[in-house]
Design a protein with these regions (language model features):
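Short, flexible loop/turn elements at secondary-structure junctions
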Residues: 72-74, 84, 98, 108-110, ...
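Carbohydrate-interacting/catalytic domains
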Residues: 1-175, 179, 196-207, 488-497, ...
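Non-transmembrane alpha-helical segments in soluble domains
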Residues: 203, 207, 252, 321-325, ...
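Substrate-binding/active-site clefts of carbohydrate-active enzymes
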Residues: 143, 160-176, 182-362, 646-649, ...
């Protein structure tokens, strides 16, 4: 039994939370009440979250047949039909129990030659909204008819997948270096890429680039490809346009063999409104998986909201959390849309005071659910990671549950890409404020682990721009060949490298990159839609650009590899906060260190300063080990990479004596030096 009257550690550690102590205690009590009830009923939350082993199709060896079960409490009548009964809607009636669960049994002797692996089926549901042909919520395979475009559930009962030998442990990989990817648009061809193609062609690229985790978007089935996977229709079915469930499992297994953790982009913030494909009004009511009326609608996303306070909905979602870890061996989740989940206003307010995090605008049921989800993930797979996409800064998001927190391992550093966009859009280079930059990069509590990123898929979507395109725009079409000369391209490439190095070295304890951005992939993402003639031209990745030895893209890609290698070798992310040594606003130069590494960033567009004197953390010999200005990365090589800089004692402005070195501090350059004793 989890109950306590002690002061929660989250409050003990942060006096700013003292006025909210009563509400934090209530939150913790809501969680403990729920987890205690779960443990009394099922023994543990791991054993509780087994909906996928009861609902849907389940083999009964004792009775020699198959059960089909679905929770439809508001339905008046339910039938199952498919190719196994010539699509006769009202032939096979399901039976209802006292809890609103409808079931039908299919004896092997009767259906052996009719109900086979791959058979198609649907439910015929009579509810308050009339008679509807529907796809079950627990369907594990859903396919689209190419002619009619209709989706249908598929009876999926292959031979068990062979996971033998897959004992991958993500915790042994060190700090997370995440490669964010979308399977469908990962290929160069115009069309939808497959799990198999991703396994064979893209995983080796990710491994070679030095990343140790791949974060997969759009895994759960979604009817509209252009939704980027965020309007989910079937929560237990992998997107069939990319292949079979077994091919997705093979992708995960191969990633593990390469030493790559696989993180799933999990969408539990909302679900698609569609009746034909999704779970909306599945039992005929508007309050099946959501609250009734406006309370169950997300107006900003035109989608439906889950009722996180309903036991059956919590069970459905928690079962879904366990399902992907258990059946597909995913190594954790990025929980999408957490801000929308935890506030009734979905975060569309100014978080200008403490009360915003504790008033009636907070969805307490969602907070309880997320806490339970984190408990489940870490109880079932202790090495798994959970990442929260929360822009509000909700206190306790990454604090352990036992301390009064919500239990996420990481939060996304969403203020970082916003800062870079604002800077590039609104501020001339010579007016960049290096103190503001430093504050944004390091603005996090010590115990809150942050995933730093300069850009993700959000910045690549149509209507926005990638960093590369924001920096170089149409010049990329004409001057990315190595023989061409362009001050726009020179500036863009220099800043592209500096921004990424600044982000990874100061922004957090993990790092994320969206596929292709490491080599400056041009243009944004535009999925096929009526407005572009259903074209796939901008829903793909042009890997050939980075492989073409006559183009500059390979220089950016080579820099990214070198940057990742250095950060991993010297455990920069494990060091958490950088040690700020100097901030020279006049020359736009900042100096900081991580262990024996010294980082010097000169953001000035023109000022290159010979014999520039700067403080270092410890005496010794400093040698450059990485520079954005190296010729191998498309730079001008204005510094000698074999130079040695010996420290000498000197006094700072406050008359404190400390070791210094002198360097050639070149404009728009970031250089990393290694201290040798």
């Amino acid at each position: 039994m989890e109950k306590t009257t002690r002061r929660l550690p989250i409050v003990e550690r942060d006096e700013w939370l003292l006025p909210a102590e009563q509400e934090l205690n209530r939150r913790y009590e809501r969680y403990t009440d729920k987890i205690n009830a779960i443990e009394q009923a099922a023994g543990s939350i791991v054993d509780y979250a087994n909906g996928y082993r009861y609902f849907g199709w389940q083999r009964d060896e004792l009775l020699d047949g198959w059960w089909l079960r679905e929770w439809l409490p508001g339905a008046h009548d339910v039938y199952v039909f498919g190719d196994f009964n010539n699509w006769q809607r009202t032939e096979i009636r399901m039976q209802r129990d006292a809890h609103g669960v409808w079931s039908a049994f299919f004896p092997e002797a009767m259906y052996r030659d009719r109900l086979r692996h791959g058979s198609l089926y649907k439910l015929h549901v009579h509810g308050d909204n009339g008679w509807k042909d529907r796809i079950p919520a627990y369907a594990t395979r859903v396919v689209q008819d190419e002619a009619t475009k209709n989706y249908t559930a598929q009876f999926w009962a292959p031979e068990p997948f062979d996971w033998q030998g897959d004992a991958f442990d993500a915790s042994k990989n060190g700090s997370l270096m995440i490669y964010e990817a979308h399977v469908g648009m990962a290929q160069e061809k115009e069309g939808v890429g497959t799990y198999r193609e991703f396994t064979e062609k893209i995983l080796p690229i990710i491994k070679k680039d030095g990343y140790n985790a791949v974060q997969l978007m759009a895994i759960a089935e979604h009817p509209y490809y252009g939704s980027f996977g965020y309007h989910v229709s079937s929560f237990f079915a992998p997107a069939s346009r990319c292949g079979t469930p077994e091919e997705l499992k093979e992708l995960v297994r191969r990633a593990h063999e390469l030493g790559l953790a696989v993180i799933m982009d999990l969408v539990h913030a909302h679900y698609v409104r569609n009746l034909n494909e999704g779970i909306n009004e599945l039992d005929g009511t508007d309050h099946h998986y959501s609250l009734p009326g406006k309370a169950g609608y997300q107006p900003y996303w035109d989608s439906k909201l889950f009722d996180y306070g309903k036991d059956e909905v919590q069970h459905f979602l928690l079962s879904n959390v366990k399902y992907w870890l258990d059946e597909f061996h995913f190594d954790g989740y990025r929980f999408d849309g957490v801000t929308s989940m935890i506030y009734h206003h979905h975060g569309y307010v100014d978080f200008d005071c403490r009360e915003r995090f504790f008033d009636e605008g907070v969805n307490r049921d969602a907070l309880t659910y997320l806490t339970l989800a984190n408990r489940l993930v870490h109880d079932f797979r202790p090495a798994a990671v959970t990442i929260a996409e929360d822009v509000s800064g909700m206190p306790g998001m990454c604090i352990p549950i036992a301390d009064g927190g919500i239990g996420f391992d990481y939060r996304l550093g969403m203020a970082i890409p916003d800062f870079w966009i604002k800077e590039l859009k609104e501020v001339p280079d010579e007016e960049w404020n290096i103190w503001e930059m430093w504050d944004v990069m390091t603005n996090r509590l010590p115990e809150v682990k942050t995933v730093a990123y300069a850009e993700s898929h959000d910045q690549a979507l149509v209507g926005d721009k990638t960093l590369a395109f924001r920096l170089m725009d149409k010049e990329m079409y004409y001057h990315m060949d190595r023989a061409s000369e362009s001050i726009v391209i020179d500036r863009g490439m220099a800043l592209h490298k500096m921004i990424r190095l600044m982000t990874i070295s100061t922004g957090g304890q993990a790092y994320l990159n969206f596929m292709g951005n490491e080599f400056g992939h041009p243009e944004g993402i535009d999925f096929p839609r009526e407005g572009n003639g259903w074209s796939y031209a901008h829903a793909r990745r042009q890997w050939s650009l980075a492989k073409n030895g006559f183009l500059r893209y390979s220089w950016l890609g080579d820099f990214d590899k070198a940057m990742i290698k250095l950060v991993k070798r010297y455990k920069v992310l494990e060091d958490s906060y950088a040690w700020n040594l100097a901030m020279d606003e006049c020359n736009k130069t900042m100096v900081f260190s991580h262990g024996n590494l010294l980082f010097v960033f000169n953001w000035h567009p023109t000022a290159s300063i010979p014999d520039y004197e700067l403080p270092v953390q410890a005496p010794g010999k400093y040698v450059p080990v990485l520079s954005t200005d190296e010729r191998r990365f498309g730079g001008q090589q204005r510094q000698a990479m074999d130079a040695e800089h010996f420290s000498f004692p000197a006094r700072d402005g406050d008359n404190t004596e400390r070791p210094h070195i002198r360097i050639y501090n070149t404009s728009r350059t970031a250089t990393v030096y290694l201290r040798k004793k």
